Amino acid sequence: EFYEEFYAKFHYAESFPGWGEKPTFYKILNNLNLEKYKNEVYRAAKEVIVEALEKSEDKSVTVLCIGQANNVADVLSGNSALFYQKVKRVVVMCGNFNDYEYEYRLGDMYWKGEFNVILDVKSMQKLFAEKNLPVCVLDFNQGFDVLSGEGLAAQKDNPVRDAYIAHKVGQSLNMPSWDIMALMFASREFGNMFSLSEKGSISVDDDGKTTFSSESGEHCLIYRKADQKAFSECINELFMVKV
């Protein structure tokens, strides 16, 4: 219900506080050449994931989850044995493991917790109920002050630039880099920029609050080891594709 109410407000509101007018948002989207995708038939995400796992070697797959966990939870619900057989670890961007509560606001809607968790609490609960599944979590605090995207405005024909413009709607293209940092960790190429907590277990309560316990479990938290500036410079360099 919360999910439906949130997206109803997102899609049908005439304007968004701090985001700009809705017509501008849709005008930008319409300029991104989406016509060629309209007649495509897309398979369910669960089917695509299961097929990819079936074709993979045992313990060779890193699953990256930078949004809601519904697709991963769906696979675990119906194909748990396959998931454990093929997956080496799951890297997730979610949660708020600091001692304070961060409050979001959209119109008259308030909620506390982290966005990816709150929008589908049950799926996150399903994922983290798997205490023996290796799961590494980068919470939003790790990327909140790592800003990237400032150089994209000058990059013509850059799909990342188009995505940032559509998302930011007339604002500065600089934005927090939590998702990209999770991707960097998952790729292993940037492993020296991160550190890991001891192993333990992560739980999610019905309000979306995330808690880490160092008791039993195969979960761990990802911390940034490099400083804020190093991350921002690295990510901005990655964005500068050749055109």
What are these model-predicted stretches?
Residues E1-V243:
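N-terminal acidic, glycine/proline-rich low-complexity segments
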